[in-house]
Design a protein with these regions (language model features):
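Phosphate/pyrophosphate-binding catalytic cores of soluble transferases and nucleic-acid-acting enzymes
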Residues: 1-252
Length: 252
């Protein structure tokens, strides 16, 4: 987005801090704020005021965990997380290396389970009065078809060149930005491990899997309002319904 070097780490706590400043600025100008995106962790952390312990990071511990992952894979680390924090491990996909390592780091540095953050957030009053709208499809095959079309559009819009430019400049570091679906599946293609068609199919598959996880995540949001695109005859009707909900919320 032009404000962060993609080779530098960028955490959810960084996002919450930056987003909070932008929201304050928009409110100061007498405007309403719309947050648009699909990452449940980031949305919840901002809107629900999830607390972040300042002293929960340790570069040496994180480095050791990353070295263990490089040597032995994710399975031993995930097993350790399940032993330290079964509840927290249940909410993290075992293939999400970054979050597994972060959760372990938190447990080891603070001596508390990573899942305690979410529980603590319930005792903290959020500074925002937000209304969450979730857009999906009732028919799963329709959703998957739209995901496949979206991936094709990403390539038409220049994803391949964007990822290749990054690869040539930085290689394949493990920062958050390049762990995003669409980047990480292309790096093996650049290294000659498989074809472009295989890379594209991997992106589609991983996006479908991610969509399933996000549906599960947002179903846990008790105050979320769901809008299903296949309930409407035309996109304009869907947009009108969303506008009505937003307008009613801002007028309250």
């Amino acid at each position: 987005m032009g404000f962060q070097d993609p080779a530098e780490p960028f955490s959810v706590s960084d996002y919450v801090a930056l987003a909070g400043k932008v929201i304050e600025d928009i409110h100061a100008r007498g405007k309403n704020v719309l947050l648009v995106g699909g990452t449940g962790l980031y949305a919840r952390s901002l809107l629900k005021a999830v607390p972040f312990t300042e002293n929960s990071r340790d570069d040496e511990i994180r480095g050791n965990l990353e070295a263990e992952f490089a040597a032995d894979g994710i399975e031993p680390l995930y097993a350790r997380l399940k032993a330290l924090d079964p509840e927290g491990a249940e909410g993290i996909h075992p293939n999400n290396t970054r979050r597994v390592i972060r959760a372990l780091e938190y447990c080891m540095v603070t001596g508390e389970p990573f899942s305690k953050q979410a529980k603590d957030s319930k005792a903290v009053k959020s500074p925002y009065d937000g209304k969450m709208l979730v857009l999906s499809f009732r028919d799963r095959e329709t959703l998957y078809g739209r995901i496949n079309l979206r991936v094709e559009q990403m390539f038409a819009d220049g994803l391949l060149k964007e990822a290749e430019d990054y690869f040539k400049r930085y290689g394949t570091p493990g920062q958050t930005s390049v762990q995003a679906i669409g980047y990480k599946e292309l790096f093996p293609y650049f290294e000659g491990q498989y074809s472009l068609d295989e890379a594209k199919e991997n992106i589609k598959r991983e996006t479908r899997r991610y969509a399933k996880r996000q549906l599960t995540w947002f179903r846990r949001e008790e105050d979320a309002v769901w809008l299903f695109a296949d309930d409407f005859d035309a996109p304009a009707d869907l947009i009108s319904a969303a506008e009505d909900i937003a307008r009613a919320h801002f007028e309250d």
